[in-house]
Structures are given as C-alpha cells and as structure tokens.
C-alpha cells in the first residue's frame, strides 16, 4: 500500500507506474500485490497460491536474475518426448541398422545431412595396408641413378664416359677449373666428376699391378733346378751324394779278401 501511495502522490518521480503487462488497469485503480523481496528469487515457486498464475513472479523493475518462463517450453517437452519414443527419426542413426529415414518435415535435421551418410559395403571393411607393408617396386628414374644397398650409383652414358676418358688420358689429376667446365658440359656435378677420376685412377693402379705380377711369373720358371741324386754330372763325374756310399763299401771288400 505504501508503494501505491507513493505512485499516486508523486507522478513526476514515477512517470510510468510499474504494473504487470497482463493487467489492463489504470494507474489510479492499480493495487500492487504483496511486497517483493530482493531474495525472493532464491525461493521455489509454489503454484496455486491465491489462484494467481503470476503470483511470486517479480516485476520487471526489480531486475530478477532469472528470465521468465517461456510459453513454448511445454511444446518443447512434448516434442522431446515424442522424439524419444520414436528414435528412428533422428538423422544420425546409420541406415544399415535402422531402415527408417528422417522425414522432411520433422524439423530435427534436414534431409541433406542424412543423405550424406555413406552406405556401408563389404569393400569398405577392408583395411588399407600400411606403407611398410606394401610391396616396394623399384622406380626407374630418368636421372640415370640406380640404388645399390644404401648408396646411389650414377650410371654414366657413353658420351660422358668418352669425354671423361679423353680428359683422363690428357691428365690423370683434373684441376678445379677443368672439373667445373667438364661438369657443366656433360650435365654432371663436380662431385660426380671427382669420384669418376678417383675410381679411374684406382682401376688403373689395379691393372698395372696385375701386369707386373704376370711379368714376374715367367722369370721364376726359367731358373735351373738342381740335378737328382746319382745322376752323372756335366763332366761325367758322379754327384757328391754317391761319395759316402763308395767310402762305406770299400772296407767291406778288404775284409772279405783277407779272410782264411
């Protein structure tokens, strides 16, 4: 009553008196309800008191921390209950397990989402092999490189080998400047040219060593061999190996002559 008295007394301070929007009453005939408390929102609302459907709802001027109840909550609850009783209307159910498809007017999910679900097939159950399980096929690249164990070996063309052999015949040790020029002319890197010259020098040393071994073998076969024991020497004399046998046999013959 005190609040209504202040509203009627001083209209300048309260130009728009506070009243519930559902009551079509004039400001003079407005009678406020029970006094509202600041901590009223913390209490639970008990329906049916004084048969007032808006009893216990704070006015807008008091700034209730909770938003008023929406009118479409009841319809939302019925829709949720109907959806729970019929789970086949959801679009996220896989088509293999539930043959029912979502209706266009259900409002849950558009039909485009349900149509984008991929159809399961026996081929989809196959697992793709890992990279290390796949069979490795040696790829023949056009750069002329082949893989030997853990290193790459450059396969030189006939033209490249011919030019490198010419340069090696001129000088077995190539200079830095000539190495750069030859690499640019043959389409190789300086490192490849350097490695080719190193391998070529090693091959030449191996060939020269083999030639020296072949030349030393005929000289060793022409050396004179010692004569066998008991064979006559070059002047018709016996070898020294028969001399002990003659000396040992002479005393025996002497003893036999003087025996009685």
From Swiss-Prot:
Stretch list, region Disordered: 204-260
Lineage top rank: taxon: Eukaryota
Alphabetized UniProt keyword annotations: Activator, DNA-binding, Homeobox, Nucleus, Transcription, Transcription regulation
Record Gene3D superfamilies: Homeodomain-like (1.10.10.60)
Biased composition (Low complexity): 213-223, 240-252
GO molecular function: DNA-binding transcription factor activity; DNA-binding transcription factor activity, RNA polymerase II-specific; methyl-CpG binding; RNA polymerase II transcription regulatory region sequence-specific DNA binding; transcription cis-regulatory region binding
Gene Ontology biological process terms from the UniProt entry: anterior/posterior axis specification; cell differentiation; digestive tract development; embryonic pattern specification; positive regulation of transcription by RNA polymerase II; regulation of transcription by RNA polymerase II
Any single GO CC term annotated in Swiss-Prot or TrEMBL for this entry: nucleus
Subcellular location: Nucleus
InterPro entries in the record: Caudal_activation_dom, Caudal_homeobox, HD, HD_metazoa, Homeobox_CS, Homeodomain-like_sf, HTH_motif
Record feature DNA-binding region, as residue ranges: 149-208
SMART domains registered for this protein in UniProt: HOX
Interaction with DNA, as annotated region: 152-173
Region (Interaction with 5-mCpG DNA): 191-202
Signal peptide (residue range): none
Stated family: Belongs to the Caudal homeobox family.
Main function: Plays a role in transcriptional regulation. Involved in activated KRAS-mediated transcriptional activation of PRKD1. Binds to the PRKD1 promoter. Could play a role in the terminal differentiation of the intestine. Binds preferentially to methylated DNA.
Protein's recorded name: Homeobox protein CDX-1
Native organism: Gallus gallus (Chicken)
Annotated gene: CDX1
